[in-house]
């Protein structure tokens, strides 16, 4: 697909791959922290906490059983693609635990399974992606510390990058979420897309101060006097996103706007898959949402490498010395767990035995 930025026409990745990139970004703590900044300047807030999305996999199973079977087959072939809670062991160390999290405020997600809650309660140390989320001020400071990474500093505005139709669609989408268009006019497309991708009900809960899962885990632990450690900084997440081409993020934003209310269905389906532990089905499911196509310029491959795989390595490397103390409860985004390059396999390569807790 070709889009125009300024006077340049550029070829960008196909719809399916771009949506995968957007949803992967949705799983970054950075996107969750961003909302605190946006909502702080919002003059209006969405009032309804009720999410109205439907499960796309249920619909697919009914309408296209063959395609559904393909999705299940691909998910089953994903290493460590089943389960969100894992036990980490090593001779001479107390058992530690790994939870795949989802950075949302959905009460179904916040309600940890009893065995996971018991492990969290009994742990000496809590590890999350970034401990900066314990303070909204620190999170906001991290986001604003490098304005060139989050904002256009050369006079560019989002209005100049979008068609009149897409710009109007963006304004309407933000208004439904209680975010004024003026608040994001100079923000980079990926910053805006992170907010637009979330259902209005999620925005509403965040506006009311309801924490997302990782934030709640960390806050509860800090209140109990437990040590809370982070594996990366929000600035590092910021840098990773900013290193990808603006055209990539602009296309993600446009596609999010085009999906409209269907994004509610996508997020609801992701949530259902998370709650059932079918993490390996997330990416195959997303491929059914957008049209098929080839990624001629390998944009998604670059995204996956920089945002998922590279960060997996950082998380596993930095977690190892903390896990060496034993009795650790670690929570990172669930999409970081599965696959040959996932956190689970990387921890195994460091000598840990990691097994699923049923």
Predicted segments, located by residue:
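Sec/Tat signal peptide C-region and signal peptidase I cleavage site
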Residues: 42-46
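Bacterial N-terminal signal peptides
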Residues: 16-17, 21-40
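N-terminal secretory signal peptides that target proteins for export/translocation
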Residues: 1-24
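Structured, acidic catalytic/metal-binding patches in enzyme active sites
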Residues: 47-303
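Intrinsically disordered, low-complexity segments
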Residues: 7, 40-41
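C-terminal soluble interaction/assembly domains
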Residues: 301, 305-358
